[in-house]
Swiss-Prot record:
Chain positions of motif 'KMSKS' region: 359-363
Compartments reported by the entry: Cytoplasm
Binding partners and assembly: Monomer.
Species in which this protein is naturally found: Beutenbergia cavernae (strain ATCC BAA-8 / DSM 12333 / CCUG 43141 / JCM 11478 / NBRC 16432 / NCIMB 13614 / HKI 0122)
Protein name (record): Methionine--tRNA ligase
Annotated positions binding ATP: T362
Cofactor: Zn(2+)
Function of the protein: Is required not only for elongation of protein synthesis but also for the initiation of all mRNA translation through initiator tRNA(fMet) aminoacylation.
Gene giving rise to this polypeptide: metG
Length: 614
């Protein structure tokens, strides 16, 4: 058994999330986490809403609310959407908790004490019309490296390089288009050059990463410069140093604090586990260390899931923070109270999802929100599309015609039809799983196929090849469908022994396929598991709890959590024998067939949304 940390990118609370977001961080991380739990590993899946930074401040001003009011609103929207999609977080929290503030400030103080957070004078942008600070990501211009006209003041999304706003060609404000004025300002910088040797040595051992992630990360080593980790802004975590902590206009950079969220969420999870246990016993408030502190004899692995625009922060900034905290750069140093912390085992980056050939854009109305999708369609239909046709290793396109086709042809007519006709024949002819007679070669062959699927699909999931994994699982479904068609049980009414054997074999094969598909289709999997008389929980669902801030009783907020292994019997990743005599009721359709009309209806919704914003 391994301790598996599933660290999932934190969605930003400047609005509801669309399906492109969950295709990058959400569904892939949940598929992996569900499989690893079923395979017997101790999984800790954590994330939360990212609530600091300039976009929150600007949007709050536009809406006439405080940043906290804005993030409170969208935190609840995002929590509901991700829970309804079935994302099985052990803890989904937020970055405005007192716990998160304390963990981030401890990290900053220790990195600073070890000599890797250095104070420098830099050029900051001012809006000439308002006299206010203009944060770097609200400045755009032409990238001095690749020439892309649309680069931000902190990063070029075209070439992925980190930038300084003052280096942009023809810089302009994204708020009103004016040219900013640059003045001197003081900031703390993460000294990446002092951590370069340790960072490079670690990265060169990551040969198992996806090539696009590894190559991009290694290329970043060619131009390592100190990176500003504070900002001229009044919304964020205070800088925890004398002379800085009381300055209302200086805050920690949102990306410095966001990546630390994986650690702070793990700590909050452990504290809540202790609280739920009555403050004593196991698990306790230090339980998070089993995933984070290197421990001899304990296999610990950490997987970070995100879209490709966040690779830099997870393969460079976060590892550099961890190395600086441990004192493993050129200046040495000692770890802080959390001890040495594990570096990422793997950074799992997805590419971008587009829709109908266009980039998602909420401002232009080119968007399909998760909550709208789930209001009209089954969550497993969206999960399946992302798994089988999502942007795993290259950009992919979501179209309504393809969504309808895959739902109808593969889920309804393929997997759903197999479940329905098998259960219907068992119910009609026996009312329960029949006792099998002697199996023929054709029966043994189909069971050998389904049982082989556990190793094959599992191997693909462990190596982050989810598209190949779900394709293989559906290939096995096709073999079982072929078996039922070729054995023709509907023609065996006068041969009860043979009919019983075929239907027992088919039921066993369907049960096996259901386990193979459970990480991808958890809602359907649990329904099918129960319909076939299965015991225990095959695909546990998350729940939303309203909790009080652990360090501020005046604040409450929703979290996503669940009982996925602890306190429940989780069906394992293996073939479990169906039991003769188990009652089988007449089934209801598992998946809903989509009418051809939905394609034009959804396209019209998108056109109307775009017209409103034109």
């Amino acid at each position: 058994m391994s301790h598996i940390l599933s660290a999932v990118a934190w969605p930003y609370t400047n609005g509801p999330r669309h399906i492109g977001h969950v295709a990058g961080f959400g569904v892939p991380s949940d598929v992996f986490s569900r499989y690893m739990r079923m395979a017997g590993h101790d999984v800790l899946m954590v994330s939360g809403t990212d609530e600091h930074g300039t976009p929150i401040l600007v949007l709050a001003e536009q809406e006439g609310v405080t940043p906290q009011e804005l993030t409170d609103r969208y935190n609840r929207v995002i929590v509901d959407d991700l829970a309804n999609l079935g994302l099985s977080y052990d803890l989904f929290t937020r970055t405005t908790t007192r716990n998160h503030y304390a963990v981030v400030q401890e990290m900053f103080r220790t990195v600073h004490k070890n000599g890797y957070m250095v104070e420098q004078t830099t050029m900051g942008a001012i809006s000439p019309s308002t006299g206010r600070t203009l944060p770097d990501r609200y400045i755009e211009g032409t990238c001095p490296i690749c020439g892309y006209d649309g680069a931000r003041g902190d990063q070029c999304d075209n070439c992925g390089n980190q930038l300084d706003a003052v280096d942009l060609i023809n810089p302009r404000s994204r708020i009103n288009g004016e040219k900013p004025t640059f003045i001197e300002t003081q900031h703390f910088f993460l000294d990446l050059p002092a951590l370069a040797d340790a960072l490079g040595a670690w990265l060169r051992t990551r040969t198992h990463w996806r090539p696009n992630v590894l190559n991009f990360s290694l290329n970043l080593l060619d131009d390592l410069r100190p990176r500003a980790m504070t900002r001229d802004i009044d919304w964020g975590i205070p800088v925890p140093l004398p002379g800085w902590e009381d300055n209302p206009a200086k805050r920690l950079y949102v990306w410095f604090d966001a990546v630390i969220g994986y650690l702070s969420a793990s700590i909050e999870w452990a504290r809540r586990q202790e609280l739920a246990a009555g403050g004593a016993g196991t698990p306790d408030a230090e339980a998070w260390r089993a995933w984070w502190n290197p421990t001899p004899g304990l296999d610990q692995q950490s997987y970070y899931f995100m879209g490709k625009d966040n690779i830099t922060f997870h393969s460079q900034i976060w590892p550099a923070e961890l190395l600086g905290y441990a004192g493993k750069g050129s200046r040495g140093g000692e770890p802080g109270i959390y001890g040495e912390l594990n570096l990422p085992t793997e950074v799992v980056s997805s590419e971008f999802l587009t829709t109908e050939g266009k980039q998602f854009s909420t401002s232009r109305g080119v968007v399909v929100y998760v909550r709208d999708m789930l209001a009209r369609y089954q969550p497993d239909a969206l999960r399946y599309f992302i798994a089988v046709a999502g942007p795993e290793s290259s950009d992919s396109d979501f179209t309504w015609s393809e969504f309808k086709r895959r739902t109808n042809d593969e889920l309804v007519a393929g997997w759903g039809n197999l479940v329905n006709r098998t259960a219907t024949m068992v119910h009609k002819n026996f009312g329960a799983v029949p006792e099998p007679g002697e199996r023929l070669a054709v029966d043994e062959a189909v069971l050998a196929t389904t049982r082989a699927g556990f190793a094959q699909v599992g191997r693909l999931l462990e190596t982050q090849r989810q598209r190949a994994a779900v394709t293989e699982a559906m290939r096995v479904v096709g073999e079982v469908n072929k078996y039922v068609s070729e054995t023709e049980p509907w023609k065996l009414k006068t041969d009860r022994d043979r009919l019983a054997t075929v239907l027992h074999t088919a039921t066993q094969a369907v049960a096996d396929c259901n386990v193979l598909l459970a990480p991808f289709l958890p809602h359907a999997a649990q329904e099918i598991h129960s319909a076939l008389g299965g015991t225990g929980t095959l695909a546990p669902q998350p729940r939303v709890d309203e909790v009080t801030d652990l360090d501020d009783a005046s604040r409450s907020y929703p979290i996503i959590t669940g009982d996925y292994v602890r306190g429940e019997t989780l069906a394992p990743w293996e073939s479990a024998a169906v039991v003769a005599g188990t009652p089988i009721e007449k089934p209801s359709p598992v998946f809903t067939k989509l009418d051809d009309a939905i394609v034009e209806e959804e396209l019209e919704r998108m056109r109307a949304g775009a017209a409103e914003r034109a």
